[in-house]
Amino acid sequence: MGFGNEGDSATPEEQGTLYLPRILLDSPDGTAVNRLIQTWYEENQRDTKESGQTDALEADGLPIWDPMWDHVWYAANTWDGMLSVGILCRNVFGSVHVQGGWAFDLDHGTLLDNQEVLAQVGISQFVQAVRQELRAMVTQEWDAIAQRSAQPGDVIAEHAEENRDRRLAEIQSGQHDPEDPAVFVTGDGAVCLSVWNPSQEYYYDGGDEDWTTLITLHAASTLQNAG
């Protein structure tokens, strides 16, 4: 849909360049994103070593932004199971990287609050695009999890679609258990579904890693009436 490109004429100064600790996001070609991820990854490794926890990314290696990818997913494990998920949707936002409560404009090296992004693109366009994109993402991610889990002792592979559809329906209709640790709302209002939850056997790789893969749903507002 490409509406994220409507802000391409704005300069970083006009958009209000913000800072992350020790990193100025000032590159339009992706190097700033790679530097951000590299620094975050190194800090995560130090934290995991100090805490004695297992680093969830050790097996997969460092994720690097590539302009040819439509979607880039990366995840960091946290000790309480609350995960940060990065999603790069170039075919939705043009070149806006959305994570948690902020968005990174790859064209201008600018870090924006998600509210600023919504103000720029319009809530109706945002909802329409994200609804379409997340439907594909949920399916792709769930299928990938089912494939990874297709091992003796796993149960998700056999019931992946059934579980996915049931959980999405519960969230969309507001019927999910508010105490369910697999579902929570982030600070910017995104409804997240954990697909790793030992009690519900969504995904478990047999190891002892304390990590969760989240699918950001923006549920009721973005997925309902999708078709």
Where are these regions (language model features)?
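Compositionally biased intrinsically disordered regions enriched in Thr/Gly
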Residues: 1-227
